[in-house]
Structures are given as C-alpha cells and as structure tokens.
Amino acid sequence: MGWKTVMKQQKLVEKMTIEEKAALLSGKTVWQTREIDRLSIPSIFLSDGPHGIRKQAGAGDHLGLNASLNATCFPTAATIANSWDQDLGEEIGQALGEEAASMDVNILLGPGLNIKRSPLCGRNFEYFSEDPYLSGKMAASYIRGIQSKGVYACPKHLAVNSQELRRMAMDAVVDERTLREIYLTGFEIAVKEGHAKAIMSSYNQINGIYANEDKHLLTDILRKEWGFDGIVVTDWGGSNDHVKGVAAGSNLEMPSCGYDSAREVIAAVRNGKLKEADLDERVGELVDAVMELTSGKKLSDKNFDRNAHHQLARKAAAESMILLKNEKQILPLDTKKSIAVIGDFAFSPRYQGAGSSMVNPTKVEDMSSILQQYDLNILGMTRGYQRNGDVDENDRKFALNLSMNADIVIFCFGLDEISESEGLDRTHMRIPQDQIDLLQDISKVNENVIGILSAGSAIEMPWHTCCKAILHGYLNGQAGASATLDILTGKVNPSGRLAETYPISYEQTPAFRYYPSNEKTSEYRESVYVGYRYYDTSKVRVQYPFGFGLSYTEFTYSDLIIEEDGIKVSVTNTGDRDGAEVVQMYVGLPNAIVFRPEKELKGFAKVYLKAGESRQLRIPFDDKTFRYWNIKTGQWEIETGTYQIMVGASVADIRLTGMTERTGNSKGYPYNPAKMPYYYTGIVQKISDEEFRELLGHDIPNGRWSGNLEINDAICQMYYAKSRLARLIYRCLTKMKKKSEAQGKPDLNILFIYNMPFRGIAKMTGGAVSMEMVYGIVDAVNGHFMRGVKKVVGGYFRNRRNNKKYEKLLKEAGGKC
C-alpha cells in the first residue's frame, strides 16, 4: 500500500457542499467536531488525557479551569518512562482507553513525547525521556493499549516543542539531522509500531514554517515515509493559516473559531490558492476517522472498574520509582525502628503537574492517612515546612525534636506546584530552599534520613549527602503513597531506572546558553548532543546517569553473543530477593567519519528474576540501530565500520562489550571536520555562529524582536508596543502572573494569554473575534489607535453578518435530500 490510503467515505464527501467541507475542518466547540446530520456524519469528542481523562462536565475550556469528571490519575509519562516496561505502558493505555470510552471520548490527546531538551521545560513531567528511542517505545505501548478500546490516541506535539515560554510564537532553528534523529524518531516509532490514528501538530515554527503548515513534515515524512493514515489535529489555538495547514496535510483545527477559517478555505479554493482535491482529501481522512470511531464496537458500560484502575496506578507507580541511594541498606525499613515522618508532601502529595493534563482523580492517597495499614513503628508525623514558603517556627521545632528522638526520619519533599506547569518554564533546578534548610537541620540531629522526592523533572541535588537513602517517586499519581510505602517496607523491590540524566548543576546542561530563548527563534546549537548523548561524549560528570537505579538485590551479566540481527545476553539475580533488572543496549562507532555521540540507546529489556534465577535475553537490532541521517543525500544511511555493542545497567555502567562489523551505504559524507571541531568533540555549550551555520547548511535566521508587532508576535511582547494602553495591559498581565507565582499556584489563563500570539484571540474565542478584528487590535497596539478601532468595530459587525450567512448556507444544505 502506498502512502495515500483509499478514501473509505468518498461518496459522502462527494455529497457535501463546499461550505460543509470547509466547516467540518474546524471544531464545533472547545472539544467537539461538527456533525452533518443530513449525511449522518456525527460529531466526535476529543479530550486531554495523557495520564488520565479530563472530560469536563459543563462548559469546556482548554486549560481545565472548569471541573472535570472523575478519572483515574495514573503516574505521569515522566514517571512511567522510568519503568522501562512496555507491557506496563500498554496496560495503562488499555485502562485509559476504557475510561475514555466510558465517557464517550473518541480521541484521547496523548501521550506526549517531546524530547526533554532542557530540565527547565515546565512540561517535562508530561514527556517520557531525553532519549527518542525510549520515548517512542513507551509511547507506542500506550497507543496500542488506548486504541485497543476503540479510542484513537493522539500523540503530541509534532514537533520540536521544547519550551513553554512563547511556545505559540517561537521558531525552532534546527538542522535536519538533529530533527530526524532526536526530535522525530520517537514519533516515527509511535506511528510505525503504535499505529497511531491521530497526531497533534505543535504550536511552534520549525525553521520558519509552522509545524501545522509544514508539508515536508506532515506529508513527506509523516504520511509518505512513515505510512501514517490517520488525522492531524492542531494544538488548541495552534492554527496560524488554516488554508496552508489544509494544503500541508492538517485535518482538524481546534477549538472552534466560528466560521472565519471556513470562509478562508472557501475563498482559497475559489481563487486557486487551495486545490479542491486537497480539501477533499483532508475532509475524506477526517470523515473516515469519524465514521470508524462512531461505528465500531465501544464499551457501553459507563462505570469503569475504579478499584482495579486504582490498583493498576499503584502497581505502575511502584514499578516506576527509582531508588537513587541506599547506604548501609537502610531500606527496606526495619519495622522495629521508630520512625518520624516529616514533610508537607506526606500530608498533601504532589502527584501530577499543572495544565491541560490535570486530572480530577477518583481518589487520592496521602502517606499520613495510610501509614496505619503498614507494620511500622511510627513515632510521630508533622509537616515541618509549608510548600508555599510560609514559616511555622513551632512546627519546625517540633519536626526537629521528633527527628532527634526517632531512629529513622522519612522526609517527604520536592518541587511545588508553581515549579512545573504548562505555560511556564522553570528558572532553575533547585528544590525550594526552606525544604532544604529543614532537611539539613534534621540531618544534623539524625543521620538516618530517608528522602522521598516528588518532582516531574531533573533537579540539582547538592544536599544528597544529608540523606542515607533517596527514593524518587517523580509524580506518581493518585496511588503514589501506597506504592511508596510498598517499596519502603520491602513489599515491592524497586526497579525504576532514570529516563533522563541528573546533572550536578544546570550550568552543565548542553543547551544552558541557548535555553529558553527570549527572542523569536530558539537555536538548537547543541545538535544531537541532548541529555546523556552530551554528558557521556564530552565526559561531564553527573549526579545520576541516564538508566541508573538501585535494587534491593544484585544482578550480573554474562555470555554476550552478538549475531547479525541482534544480541543475546544472560542475566542472573545473585541476591536473596526477587527483583527486576533493565538491560540496556547501547551502540557506538569509535573513530566515526560522521560526528556522533559516544553511545546511543538502541534496545532494552526489563526482566523479572527470582532470587538465584538466570535467564538469557534477546535484544534485536532494528532499522534504527546503526543509521544516521545524511543531510547531503537526504536519506538514512549506515556508515561502514566496526560498531561497539555495549550492554549494561545504565549509560555509565556498561557490563559487557562486543563488536560487530557493518558495511555501510553512505554515498558521500556530509561534514567537514575542520569546520566543525566542537561538534566532533561533543563540547557544544559554546558553538560559534560559523560552526552553527555550517551545521544548518544555510544562514542563521535573524531572531531579534524589532519594529512593529505583528499578529504572530506573543502578547507578552506588548512590552515593546507603541501604544501606552497596550504597555499598561502588558504590565497588568505581568503583575497578575507574578502574583500567582508568589502564591505558589500557576494561573493557567494568564499564562496562556501571556504566551499567546495576537492571532490566538481569533482562534480561541469561538468565532466572536475574526482575523480582521485581530489586525485592528495589532494596529492599535502599534500606535494607530483610531485605525485599529475602526477595523475592530467594523470587523465585529461584518463577522456577525458573515457568520449568519454561513449558518444559513449550512441549514439550506441540511434541507437537501
């Protein structure tokens, strides 16, 4: 089968008027598509839900400000990635699909698999990993599970969407090789192995072209190369030019923006800017999806098994937690020892991030409430600190006295809500200082401190010496408390392994000098050296390496056999406890002609072994094991050479090494090492303009803000506005943003508006504002107040009049037989 699938509902499309076709490609409401009753084409419902369904009971809004129905809050993607367990991912996907189907949700907007370029990205908790192979494999497992229940999964955000600051008005400047190898490979796996039936385009531009309008991305790569046969959905408010989006391969603009975009599509067809064949193809793809989703078998039971899903969330959390430190085997806990439990997080757990993925859970456990279910000698519990920074000296003193009298202290701490949220990037990697001050004081009176961390992304850990053991739960969902206690008491043997590197300090990170960008462009100068690819190659010492995690037992590796199509390796549990090991296969090419990381993850397997048990595992090679993208020939190629196959327990803990010869197919190597010395060493923190230009193969775009503001500039850029009123509005927005940050709770509405381009006013107001009116607003912002007001007022009445005309045409079409 070629890339272009046969339109299953062609006869329906042929019966549609052009007004119906154009209207169908934009949403009806915030979450629903339009129906065409006369042709029996129903509306379908889309919902957020990467780690739990967020279907709102009343009026819908993009950011979840209105209450949503109860759903299971599973651990976030960043947490589950640490399990390295594809079977678990599929199990969670099935549960998500069941819950979506029970709520009549047709398309689930997830999973998120953007690459963790920097630890500071505020939405990292929603993404799997810094590694594209692990991200893709875990995403594919979720997708298979979700879609097994008659619900489409919609992986997001395609592509290169790595910062929240001005995410809707940012141009990612990235070379084609890095785009392919780092930022697209995960999506490729999700499509080819997960068979995703929908995909969400990202807000940003990629090399000057909006992702939703990028034909190279949406047609040449997604559909032709990967064989994608589903629908492309915009991120909410992410449609810039709907006509260009339709031509490029985008099917559905969300949310509803009235009929403004539909009128643009019709005008483009009539003036020849858009081929009607392209319009028909997009409509056909969408109608195919709608009919498949509404005519297939779906769960009719409105009540999913809440208890079973809660227990699955517990299992998932336990398998995903990472034991980072365990001096003198202080864990599992000795039940005879007296224990003090301290920390705000023990009473009010932080189990998910903020933003569009926030779930209204069926129930939430906290450690303080369920401790009595475990055979532990609890001396006492107290908060000791307030996560909002308020100080209660009496409680602090009580915490220190309690610690002094206990044999062991369990200290629960981590990042607060304002630290990790959609629409907001972190400014540093530190845990709030009041928590660390208390930890340090406790460690002075009790050396047996067990730190229980809650954070959705990497953090700096200069305080790690204050803890004898550290158990990192990430954001572990509604059943995280019992999962944590299962590990602390030895009921479960920890088997989580880090899906991202923990650097010693933020200044060590590869994109330190380039992230986040405060200009129009974000330059990906670090190239392929993201995460461990950078630290490992440039020999930067880290706190905890990619793939790291401890167990209550020990594993040995032996008998590595390298075959033409994969490897075999034996793993033995040499300890006295049953446990699971994550066997990781890395591949490198010493003395490569084409610069590359020292090693890259190309396969993994999680194996459960009883004490003393040994098992031979097989990890296959695939089409991604040896390839690189040759920018000179525009294709995947293999460089001839002797490749190192490295098998170990982390990127820094290689147990067995072997070699394999590969005959390549390169038809000319793309780089001149003399012109790219730092890319050949991996030391990429200070890449010059000349070297970056050589990598790109063209001049570096000018990303400076200058001149008048335009419709695609972010509203926060009104700092530069010529209008005093616009600058006043900017100051008010900034003040409200800072106030919410000071209170410790992100104001999602303010954050969205702050980062939104002016065109978003038209895209996010349900048809009340047209693009003509937006141009008037921008005129006013640029100091042409009267001209702008005339456009806004005139545009308002024209928009109302034109919307009524359009609705009349649709009603007339509906009266036809």
Language-model segments: residues:
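Glycoside hydrolase catalytic-domain context in secreted enzymes
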Residues: 1-624, 642-647, 651, 756, ...
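Terminal connector regions
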Residues: 623-670
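Charged, amphipathic alpha-helical linkers/stalks
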Residues: 651-652, 658-729
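Long, low-hydrophobicity ectodomains and other hydrophilic envelope-associated domains
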Residues: 694-817
